Amino acid sequence: MTAFRTLDDADLADKRVLVRVDLNVPMESGRVTDETRLKAILPTIRTITDKGGKAVLLAHFGRPKGRDESQSLAPVAKALEGQLGRKVAFASDCVGEEASSAISRLAAGEVIVLENTRFHAGEEKNAPDFVEALASLGDIYVNDAFSAAHRAHASTEGLARKLPAYAGRSMESELAALTKALEAPVRPVLAVVGGSKVSSKLELLGNLVKKVDILVIAGGMANTFLAALGKKVGKSLCEHDLADTAREILEKAKAAGCEIVLPVDAVVAKEFKANAANRVVSVDEVGDDEMILDAGPETVAVVAQKLDGAKTVVWNGPFGAFEMTPFDAATVAVARDVGKRTRAGTLLSVAGGGDTVAALNHAGVAGDFSYVSTAGGAFLEWLEGKALPGVEALRR
């Protein structure tokens, strides 16, 4: 992890530390309904306050067009108080006199949340005058919001160019896990890429075939590959117009020495609904009026066999329509298998993306994986091999 400056490198005593955090939490009737993201930033806040710094938290919330009280961070600051077990101040703006006087009242070791950065158009435009206004409020900048690191905004990228910049604890652990899984992995590396559409994961597949040893293609996107190989997929979700693209990806994989694993059997039904009448068939036997809704047990067995030789797993996307029983079976079986091997110490496992996290929670194994990233877009862009502006700004 020497590539990034961390809080261990910083002198924080009596410094105003601007911390970019992810406070985009679910809310109902002005109350936070899931505090997972608040818990994730506690180690960074505590490191700063323990070292005598003043923690000044910056974040966006929702997509307001200008000032909108329904998108205020005030209720989030209140919820954070409960998590921290201490008072958290709140300023009703993130720049200007209101913010600077509130920060000037802070004693060493105290915490304040500034109002939603997106109340100002300069945030998403990364406008120089807005960056300057934010920078004037702090001595040091810390980014602890990996989930927003793919955005070159004022509070994620602009500030890091203005002030001495460091990675927070959550950012640090995310970068360590991803570097371990893809940049300098213990091989063989097996990747699972699922989900409904090839079109949304073209760059991802193109990058992974060059980086991993085995690529398991699952979910609706596997149907596009099966169709490209001449299989009949009936009424299944399938991007027939991407057949040439699918074949190109298979050729790229072959040239790179990456083994592709596609489903060998499938759970099919005539209706897309929970508990619909279904049967397990070989991928050569899908009826014209049937749709593939999950991978079958033979496919699960093939993946298990490939896992026997793997040392690292990177997972993004489910095997089937996991939100509906019984079409969650393959996702649950493989997730539990990976979780069990990770617990036994034979596998390093990293997973990420919204559907993936939901699927692992559904299988009850999110806690068994080495690392589960809640950063949807940023996690995908990292897997695609793209430089993330918010991360690049933290390099030594």
Swiss-Prot record:
It is found in: Cytoplasm. It comes from the Bacteria. Its EC number is 2.7.2.3. InterPro entries: Phosphoglycerate_kinase, Phosphoglycerate_kinase_CS, Phosphoglycerate_kinase_N, Phosphoglycerate_kinase_sf. GO terms for biological process: gluconeogenesis; glycolytic process. GO terms for cellular component: cytosol. It is an enzyme of class 2 (transferase). The keyword 4Fe-4S does not apply. Substrate binds at D22, L23, N24, R37, H60, F61, G62, R63, R118, R151. One of its GO terms (molecular function) is ATP binding. It catalyses: (2R)-3-phosphoglycerate + ATP = (2R)-3-phospho-glyceroyl phosphate + ADP. ATP binds at K201, E323, G353, G354, D355, T356. PROSITE patterns: PGLYCERATE_KINASE (PS00111). SUPFAM superfamilies: Phosphoglycerate kinase. Pathway: Carbohydrate degradation; glycolysis; pyruvate from D-glyceraldehyde 3-phosphate: step 2/5. Keywords: ATP-binding, Cytoplasm, Glycolysis, Kinase, Nucleotide-binding, Transferase. HAMAP family: Phosphoglyc_kinase. Belongs to the phosphoglycerate kinase family. PANTHER family: PHOSPHOGLYCERATE KINASE, PHOSPHOGLYCERATE KINASE 1, CHLOROPLASTIC-RELATED. Monomer. This is Phosphoglycerate kinase. It comes from Xanthobacter autotrophicus (strain ATCC BAA-1158 / Py2). The lineage of its organism: Bacteria, Pseudomonadati, Pseudomonadota, Alphaproteobacteria, Hyphomicrobiales.
